[in-house]
Amino acid sequence: MQLFVRAQELHTLEVTGQETVAQIKDHVASLEGIAPEDQVVLLAGSPLEDEATLGQCGVEALTTLEVAGRMLGGKVHGSLARAGKVRGQTPKVAKQEKKKKKTGRAKRRMQYNRRFVNVVPTFGKKKGPNANS
């Protein structure tokens, strides 16, 4: 049966179905020059094991296998490396409860005391509560 292998270029292989994935990798290594240990053979997006035969993997006639190069990993570039970094480093501080604001009669009493009772007499023109002096 015919099998298509897409690596850097598209290749057509004649196989019986009893070949292992490792044998396909060796064949691709001779065609493309990619070492077999650096190859990942994919069938419909899922990687295939080296020991499995093509028949066990469900490879049929005119199926396309994709060969991807194994990438070195371990380093993430850009904003993904910093995602959640600040929030994770910041220590959790318990919220402080605010004092309840007075309402009604008690609020009016505070206003009266502030405006008329606790007033210190000053010289000059009387200034408003928001004046910058």
Swiss-Prot record:
Residues 84-110 are annotated as: Disordered. FUBI is cleaved from ribosomal protein S30 by the deubiquitinase USP36 before the assembly of ribosomal protein S30 into pre-40S ribosomal particles. FUBI removal from ribosomal protein S30 is a crucial event for the final maturation of pre-40S particles. PROSITE patterns: UBIQUITIN_1 (PS00299), UBIQUITIN_2 (PS50053). Residues 97-110 have a biased composition (Basic residues). Keywords: Cytoplasm, Nucleus, Ribonucleoprotein, Ribosomal protein. Disulfide bonds: none annotated. Pfam families: Ribosomal_S30, ubiquitin. One of its GO terms (biological process) is antimicrobial humoral immune response mediated by antimicrobial peptide. Signal peptide: none annotated. GO terms for cellular component: cytoplasm; cytosolic small ribosomal subunit; extracellular space; nucleus. The modification N6-succinyllysine is found at K125. GO terms for molecular function: structural constituent of ribosome. CDD domains: Ubl_FUBI. In the N-terminal section; belongs to the ubiquitin family. FAU encodes a fusion protein consisting of the ubiquitin-like protein FUBI at the N terminus and ribosomal protein S30 at the C terminus. This is Ubiquitin-like FUBI-ribosomal protein eS30 fusion protein. It comes from Mus musculus (Mouse). The lineage of its organism: Eukaryota, Metazoa, Chordata, Craniata, Vertebrata. The gene is Fau.
